[in-house]
Amino acid sequence: MPVSTALHQDGSQERPRSLVSTTSSSGSSRDSHSAMEEPTGSEASAQNGTGSPWDRHVPNSNNNSSGWLNMKGPLSPFNGRAGTSPAYHKLSYLGRVVREIVETERMYVQDLRSIVEDYLLKIIDTPGLLKPEQVSALFGNIESIYALNSQLLRDLDSCNSDPVAVASCFVERSQEFDIYTQYCNNYPNSVAALTECMQDKQQAKFFRDRQELLQHSLPLGSYLLKPVQRVLKYHLLLQEIAKHFDEEEDGFEVVEDAIDTMTCVAWYINDMKRRHEHAVRLQEIQSLLINWKGPDLTTYGELVLEATFRVHRVRNDRTFFLFDKILLITKKRGDHFVYKGHIPCSSLMLIESTRDSLCFTVTHYKHSKQQYSIQAKTVEEKRSWTHHIKRLILENHHATIPQKAKEAILEMDSYYPSRYRCSPERMKKAWSSQDEVSSHVRQGRRQSEPGHTLFSRATLPSRQQGFEMPGLKGRRKSEPTRHLLRQLSEKARAVGMKHAGSAGALLDFGQPAHAQKQQPEAERAAREELEEEEELVEEEEQRQQSFSGSLEGLAGHDGSEKVPGPELPGSEEEEEEEESLAVAEQGKRHRESEGSKGCRRPSNRSPTSAEKRMSFESVSSLPEVETDPEPGAEQEAFAALEGPSTEEMPSDPEFPEALETQLHAPKGLLGVDNPAAVVDFVEPEGSEDLKPLSSEEEEEEEMEAAQEPESLLPPSVLDQASVIAERFASSFSRRSSLAIEDGKSSGLGTPRLISRSSSVLSLEGSDKGLARWSSIGDSLSNPPTPEVIIGADMVTDNGPSVNGTESPSAGSGCPTEQDRSSCKKKESALSTRDRQLLDKIKNYYENAEHHDAGFSIRRRESLSYIPKGLVRSSVSRFNSLPKPDSEPAAPVGYKRPGSSRPASWTLFDLPGPRTDKGDPAPITDAEFCPSSEIAKIWERMESSERSPRTGSGQSQANGFELQEPLFILEEHELGAITEESAVASPESASPTEQPSPAHLARELKELVKELSSSVQGELVTPLHPRIVQLSHVMDSHVSERVKNKVYQLARQYSLRIKNIKAARPPLQWEKVTPDQEEQVPSISGLPEEAGELSGGKARRKPVLSLLSYEQLVAQEHGTSKSSAAVETSPRRFSFSPSAVSPRTTSPGARSSARSPLSPFDTETFNWPDVRELCSKYTSHDKTAQVESSWPRSLLVNRSRSLPENIVEPPMSGKADRCCGLNTHRRLGDGEASQPPLPESPPQSQLNGGDALYVTADLTLENNQRVIIMEKGPHPSSTVGLEEDSGKESSSPVALKGQGQGFQASAEYQPKEHGPRDSADTNKQGRVRNLREKFQALNSVG
C-alpha cells in the first residue's frame, strides 16, 4: 500500500504507523507550523493510504488521511491494514471501528515511548548536553502523557472490542486528560527550544545521530506534535462509535459521555491555544503602540479581534483592536500603530447597515461625533466583528442583563462561532449534523437541524439547566417545536439552495460528488424518523398549553430549543416572545441546514434578506427580558441588533471532513499565525470541526447547575477569575508552607484548585457528575501535598494526570500519587520498566529543582500558564474553595491542634473585604469555645459567690474602691476582660498600649454575640487579632485559666484602688479638720448622666467628667497626705503583698482610654446580704474606726457584682477593721445604688450597741426593698443625709451630721426592722427631691 510503503521505507518499524503519527506530523514539522495549525485526519485513516474521492478538505500534501469514518464500503480505512486478516473482515463495522481505536492507540503509545526512552532519557544520561530548563521546555510533560496513555492502552486492550467498555475507559480517565492541555500550552515553547537546539552544532548533531540510529524517518519535532494531534481526534473516533451504535442498547449513554468528555478536551485545547496566541499578540501590540497614554493594554482583557478597515471619510485605513473592554482605533505607520482613539465597550454602540452588507458603524453612544463607519473586506469578516461587538456590549453593559437574555440576543446572530461560545448545545450541534445518517437514528433532533440526527446525550440539556427530566432521555427537548419546522422546511430549503453558491466565502470547501450522493439517503432516513417522532410530539403537545422553554432554555440550546417539562423561572412571562424567537431561529437554521443538504453551499454565503427579516422579527420583544437597563442602556444593549444577523452558522462536522478541516485548517483550530486570522476563520458549513471544540461552556454550566442552571461565564467574569487565580497562586506558596507548619492533616489547609478536567466529566449524567464532585471533595479534604500550580484553567486535582497538580518533574502522569481519590488507576497499571523510566525522569527534575529553586517555578509556569480570561471553570470552583483573603483552612468544626498561635494566622494580612475597620478576615467558630461553655464558667463562678460566706471581707471587699468610676462592670464583662488579659496582662502593659477595661469588655461582649451566632454556622463580624489569640486559651483548661485571670485582674484593680481614690465628704461624727473641710469638694456640680442600675437591667449610671474626676483625685491625694489615718488605710484591702505598692497608672490615662459616656449592657446585679454584715459588727471605738477608714473613701462609689473569691479574705487578726470596712463600704454601696427615702427612727441595735436609724426606704423594680440607715452616737441629729453616689448636695457642711447608712436586702428587712419613724419635714423634703431625681433617671435609663 502506498502509505505502508511510505512509512516503512526506512525499515525502522515492523508495524504500520498511524497516519496521524507520521505523515501529518511530518508535514507539520516541515512547515514549521504550530501544533495546532495542521492536525490531520483521523488515526484510523492511516490504513486507507489513498485519498478518498469524497474527501472535501483544503488541498494539502497530507490530506490522504481521508474521512474513512464516514463511509461503509471498500474505501473504508480498515481495508488497508486490516484487510490482510480474514478475522478482521468478519467483524462488524462497529467492531472494526473499535479495533481501529485500540490499534491506533497502541501505535501512539509506542511513539510516545520512543520520545521518552530514545530521546528524553538519552539527553538526561548525557550530562552537559542540555540544561534542565531546555529539557523541560522541549519535552514538557510528555512523560505524564506516556504514563496516562500506557494505562489507557492497557484498559482498552482489556475491553475485548466492546464499544461500551472502550468508551467507559475515556469516561473514567476524563479528569486525567488535563495534562494534554498543559502539554499543548507548552508546545510553542517546545518548538522554540527545538529550534534553538538545532542552531547549536553539538545539539543538532545529537538529534540527527539519534534519528539515524533509531532509523526514524521523522525528526523529533514530528513526534512531539503527536500528542496534540491525538487528543484532538479522540472525540471524532468516539463519535464514529456512537454513529453506528444502536441507541436502544445499554451503554449508549456511556458512549455519549465519552464523546462529551473528549470533545471538551479538544475544545479547551483549541480555545486555550487561541487565547495564548492572542496574549502574545497583545504584548506585541503594546510594544508597537505609539501615543497611547492609557494603562497597559492587558488591563482591558483579552484581545478578541484585530483587523484593518477602510473608514468612511478617512483617507487612510484604520486598524481596529477589539479587546474585552475597549475598542482601540489606530493608524498603521510602518510596523507601529499610532493611537487615534478608543471607545469603551460599556459605551459602545453598533449600527449595522442594511444597505451595504459589508458596512457597519461603531460609535460612542454618549458622544455621537465619535463615530466610525467601517467597511469590511468580506461578509464573513463583518459577521465576526459585529457578533463579537454585540457580545462585548452585553457583557460590559452597566445594567444587569440576564445571562439567558444575552445568549438569546447573541444566538440571533448568524455568526455564532464555537470557539467563542462554548455552549453545550453548540458542541452537540457538531455531532448532530452528519451527512450520513445511520438507520439507528436517535429519537431527538436539534431544532435548528431538522434533517440531521443528533448524536449527543439527550439528558445533557436537562442537567445543564440544573434538573434531570426523567421522561425525556430518549428524545430531544426541542420536539414540541418540530411541527413548526415542517411548515418552514420547503421554503427554507429553497432559500438555502438559492444562496448556496453565493460568493464571498473565505474558505470554500466544495462538496465532493460522492458526499452529495449520500445526502438523499440521509435525508430519507431523517424524514422517516421525523414521522415517527411527530406522533410522540403531538401527544406531548396535548399535555402542554405553551412552550415551557424560556430565554433560559434558548441559551443552552442554540437559542431555539424549547424545554418541555418544568419551566424555568420567568418562562411564562416571555412565552410568546420565546415562541416567536424559536420559530424565527428555527426557520433560519433549517434553511441553512437544508441548503447544505441540497446543494452544500459555500461556507460563508451572505445571509438573504429573508433570513434577515426572520432573524429580527422578534427582536423587539427582547428588551422585555432585560432587567430594567438604565436610560440609554437599552440602546446600547440592543444597538447591535440592528442589521442583518441570521442565526448562528450551523457548522456540523461530517466526521472525515470535520477531522481533516480541524487538523488541516491553517488558522482555524489553534490560530498560530495570526490572531485576527484565527478569529476570522469561520465557515458556516465547512468548519464543522470547530463545533466539537466548543463544549467548555457545557462543563462550567453543569458544574454550576446546582446553584445557577446553565450559567455561562462572560470573558469579563473569566478575567476576574484569572485575577483571583493569580492572587491565589501568589499567596499560596506561603500559605501551603504555613499550613504544613500548622500540621493540618485533614481539612482544606492546602487546598488544590480544581482543574478544568472536572469540567470534562461534568458533561456526563447528573448522577455521575455528582459522584465525580464527591470524589473531588474527598480529594480536596485530604490533600497529599501543598503543591499548587495555577494551570490551564486551574490546577488539576486529579491523580494520574500527573503533571496537572504536581511538579511536571514528578512524572506528571506518573501514577505515584496513589492517595488522590480521583486517581482511578494506580501505579501498578504500569509495567516495571515504565515505572523505572518515569522515576528516572522525575528524579532528574527534582534534582534540578533542588539545585535551582527558580527552575521549579519556571517549569510549572511553562506548563500551566494560561492567558488572562481563560480560566473557565475557576469561578464556580472558587465558590467552594477557601478565598485567598480568608483563613486558608479552618473548616467549620475543625480545631487546630496545639495551643500555640498557628503560623498560618500570619495570612490575616492578605487583602480582602473587611466588615469592621481594623479587623482581620473572619475567623471560624472552630477557634473558640462555644458560648455555652463560657456561660457555664460564669455560672460556676456565680454559684460560688452565692454559697455561704465565711467572712464579710471576702465577699464584700470586691469592688467599691475601684478607681474606674465610669461604668458598672458586671460578671460577663469581667470575664471578657479576663480573657483579654490572657493575651496581654494589664499589669505589664503601659497605659497607652493597653485598652481600658471598658473597651475590652465591649469587644469581648461582641465576641460572645458572635460566638452565639457562629454556633449556628456563621460568624457575624470579624474579630480583633488579640481576641483571635484567645482561641487557644479557650480550647483547654478554660475554667482554670479564667479563674486565675479573674484573680489577677482583681489584684490589679486593688492596686489601683489603693493608689487612686476619690475623696468622700466626712459624716458629722467624723473628725474633720478645717483644712480637710476646705479640701473636700462639693459634689453638687457632678454631672448626672443617668440612673443607677436597677432590677438586673442595664441602666445609665452617674458619671464624673474627666476634669472633675481628676480634680477630686488631686484633692484626695492632698487629703491623704495630711491625714494621719491614711497610713493604715491601704491595708484594709490587703489582696496580696503587692497591693501595697503604688500603681503608676494615672486616673487620667484610665479615663481617657474610654469615654465616660459610653453605656454598657449589664447582666444581673447581685445585692449583698446585709445579714452577714450585721453578724460581723462588733463594738469598737467609732471615732477611731471612722478615722481609719473614711479619710480615703471614694467620693463616688458604685456597686459592682464580682465573682466570689476574686479577692483574698482579710486576715483574721484584723476583724474590727474588716467589720468597720464592710459597714462603711456597704454604706457606700447603698448610697451609690439608691437615693434615700424619708428618714425613719432607729429599729434595731447591732452587737456593738450602736443604734441604727432608718433614713430612707425604697422598693426596687425587682421587688427588693432597700433601706438606708444612719449609725452613730448622736441619734438626735437632724442633719440631712447626703449621698455620695453623685447626687446633688448644697454644701459639704451639710454632710457632717449624717449618719452612716447601709443597704439591706428585701429578705432581711422584714425580720430586722419594724415600722419606721417619721422624720422632720425639712429633711423629708430634701430626701424626696433626691428620690424623685433618682426615679426620673431610672425611667430615662
Swiss-Prot record:
Low complexity composition bias: residue spans: 18-29
Membrane spanning residue stretches: none
CC annotations in GO: cytoplasm; cytoskeleton
Record's protein name: Pleckstrin homology domain-containing family G member 3
Entry-annotated residues carrying Phosphoserine: 76, 433, 502, 571, 694-695, 737, 759, 762, 766, 862, 899-900, 947, 1129, 1134, 1136, 1141, 1155, 1158, 1201
Region (Disordered): 1-68, 433-482, 508-657, 684-715, 775-832, 876-930, 939-958, 1071-1097, 1117-1162, 1204-1249, 1271-1341
Compartments (UniProt record): Cytoplasm, Cytoskeleton
Biological role: Plays a role in controlling cell polarity and cell motility by selectively binding newly polymerized actin and activating RAC1 and CDC42 to enhance local actin polymerization.
Disulfide bond entries: none
SUPFAM superfamilies: DBL homology domain (DH-domain) (SSF48065), PH domain-like (SSF50729)
Keywords for this protein: Cytoplasm, Cytoskeleton, Phosphoprotein
Domain spans labelled DH: 93-272
Comp. bias regions, Acidic residues: 529-541, 570-580, 695-707
The organism's place on the tree of life at top rank: Eukaryota
UniProt GO BP: regulation of cell migration; regulation of establishment of cell polarity
PROSITE patterns linked to this entry: DH_2, PH_DOMAIN
Biased composition range(s): Polar residues: 42-51, 59-68, 798-810, 949-958, 1135-1162
Gene Ontology MF term list: actin binding; guanyl-nucleotide exchange factor activity
Domain PH: 296-394
Compositionally biased residues, Basic and acidic residues: 817-832, 939-948, 1309-1320
